[in-house]
């Protein structure tokens, strides 16, 4: 279903078209449903699209129709820039579980550990609780208390060009998110989930911890690069009981910094730090530069570490290990970026996810047509249109195509067009966040009302 509005400079004229067509659509098709607040969201998106189109291609923006689909599944994905893969921060959302199936936020776990350190009659449990308490304090600067938004935001999303880099992880019992086809990925980085445990002796007992994930390096190139040397900070360790990869005791080596093959563009390259799950972006044109990291958590870090970190304690070498707790690590992208897995989009990766994903900008399906064309407005009763409406995808109007993106890193020449999609993606992400916060407030009010009702029974 298409919403159309002509894009003159007069905003009031646009609103008249909007009101008329939306009114006609809703009464002609009562089954039409959309999860977003249609009037304000679409009006803002249409205005933003027209202003961005006018800035990048004024000849097309002058006297044109802008059309946006009302379907909740009709969205277009554009691969994110290579720099976004190396510099975009992500947030950590941590939950914990004990022998019971309940999950606890980190602040409740810290309270539990404080009590265990002081009151537990078992000295080994006191030591384990003290270690975990230190661990959570170490992670607290990166933990986001805002509830993450899980589940697919959109389905049946199309990506008209191949992404320069995809990330794949296979878990037989994982949460399936979707799989991009090989034709949609120029290069795929494969992650291996841990299948073993690490044993660490702490005083008089042994601690068993879920091992770290790893990166399949078969198709990566060892170019003996020194770009990872001294450039891995900031860095965090999710295994504080082991030597930290961020400490001076474990200096990075050139062999851990591998090149992602990119035959289409030799002026830019992506280097993968396989020990710290970090990506470095290098512009190799003179003078050679490298973008600094804004956060120790990158999209690759999130994809690799999103999982469950289990901890068991063993009092003696011959006793059966007992489960202490499990940390569930979940990560969310910054506003404006999304994980595209198959045809579904996500803002957050759940623990133990499985699939093949890439980073994208996400926008509603927007098309435009020449202002001299007559676009039919749906009547109160559905009628079959006799003429095909000549609509052009916004992507091609901005000069983006498979040939210009070149299936690789070299999209600097069309950065203006990509920035247009970044702005639209930020707009969409902000709307999703606003809706989520509104629903959270409503849920809190419902919970409060339910508590009052129970007290008055």
Swiss-Prot record:
Location within or outside the cell: Virion
Q: Motif CXXC: which ranges? A: 64-67
Instruction: Give the site residues for Cleavage.
Output: 387-388
Where's it mainly located? Answer: virion
**Keyword Signal among UniProt keywords:** yes
Q: Which residues are glycosylated?
A: 10, 47, 197, 222, 265, 283, 352, 370
Q: Which residue intervals make up region (Fusion peptide)?
A: 388-408
Keyword Disulfide bond present in the record's keywords: the answer is yes
- The signal peptide, as residue positions, is 1-35
Keywords, A to Z, come to: Cleavage on pair of basic residues, Disulfide bond, ERV, Glycoprotein, Signal, Transposable element, Viral envelope protein, Virion
- InterPro entries tied to this protein: TLV/ENV_coat_polyprotein
- The source's domain of life comes to Eukaryota
> Which residue pairs form cystines in this protein?
none
Q: How is it modified after translation?
A: Specific enzymatic cleavages in vivo yield the mature SU and TM proteins.
Q: What is known of its domains?
A: The CKS-17 immunosuppressive domain is present in many retroviral envelope proteins. As a synthetic peptide, it inhibits immune function in vitro and in vivo.
What assembly does the database describe for this protein?
The surface (SU) and transmembrane (TM) proteins form a heterodimer. SU and TM are attached by noncovalent interactions or by a labile interchain disulfide bond.
Question: What more does the entry say?
Answer: Ortholog of the human HERV-H_2q24.3 envelope protein.
Role noted for this protein: Retroviral envelope proteins mediate receptor recognition and membrane fusion during early infection. Endogenous envelope proteins may have kept, lost or modified their original function during evolution. SU mediates receptor recognition.
What is stated as this protein's family in its record?
Belongs to the gamma type-C retroviral envelope protein family. HERV class-I H env subfamily.
Task: Name it.
Answer: ERV-H1 provirus ancestral Env polyprotein
